[in-house]
Amino acid sequence: MLKGTFPIAKFQELQTPFYYYDLSLLQNTLDVIRNEAGKYGYNVHYAIKANANPRVLELIARNGLGADCVSGGEIQAALNAGFPANKIVFAGVGKADWEINLGLDNDIFCFNVESLAELRVINELAGKKDKVAPIALRINPEVDAHTHAKITTGMKENKFGINLSLLPSVFQEIKVSPHVKLIGIHAHIGSQITDMSAFRNLAIRINEIQDELEQVGLQVENLNLGGGLGIDYYHPNHLPIAAFDNYFAVFNKLLQLRPGQRVHFEPGRSVVAQCGSLISRVLYVKEGETRKFAILDAGFTELIRPAMYDAYHRIENISSDEPVELYDVVGPIC
């Protein structure tokens, strides 16, 4: 959120803490995404887990993006916001029966399957409805995302995806599962990735996996490369929109597509993070023997990331231009 664009007078009337979203910046970001992805005919599905605010979702849906969901609640939120079902993908390692049924009942675009057990459940539930579920296999590509360990998802020690060594047994299961149809492969290696070499390595690895699939007679219509593009938390005023141009260009340069293949992406944080701010007020100023504290009415109940894994979020004083002093900014939670 750009300092100087906050409606301070309006904020004075509101109870804090609250989240504020700059929908103009979000629209500018969506314009860039549509332009850069459109150069290559790429399909973009917004990862709803990044922010499920209804107004935010409605604006993204109006701009023609699809939705990447990891729960039944997110599928319903996407439908309510106007995302067409044929642009909704359903990922996640723990899909409950009711969530799978919700996807089946609404004829969503694809289920990103993360295990052999899940494949069997989807086949069984689709069979009860006399339907064929479109699936993509989320593979574990063994690509290091060069990001925080708690948001890395593409290594063999992670809970996500199917290890490459298990693919032969999964393919065999698909052959005897009449109510699923393999339409793609899916990979997502992590979040807040700012090193483009990770995406280059992913593209190269996908090429290798495609070659291996063809050796056993398999070719898929869709490649889903997930998301993960990072943002600049330290200088949000200078770089309010993520480097989507470089991001999509990496895959356009390196991916070896087969005729007719469609490419999909699932960005989340990079779409919405810079347009959002947590607005709080200072309740008390407290001076200890060794440090000074500014005590806010917001805590990790509103912003847990710094406490969870030392994530950095820039703090701005939007109601004063007085000289800066050093304080510990803390909340009411112990």
Give the predicted meaning of each segment.
Residues 61-62, 126-129, 153, 279-281, ...:
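Short, solvent-exposed amphipathic alpha-helical segments in soluble enzyme
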Residues 1-133, 172, 176-181, 211, ...:
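A charged N-terminal "starter" segment
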Residues 24, 47-53, 70-73, 93-95, ...:
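Active-site beta-loop-alpha junctions enriched in small/polar residues
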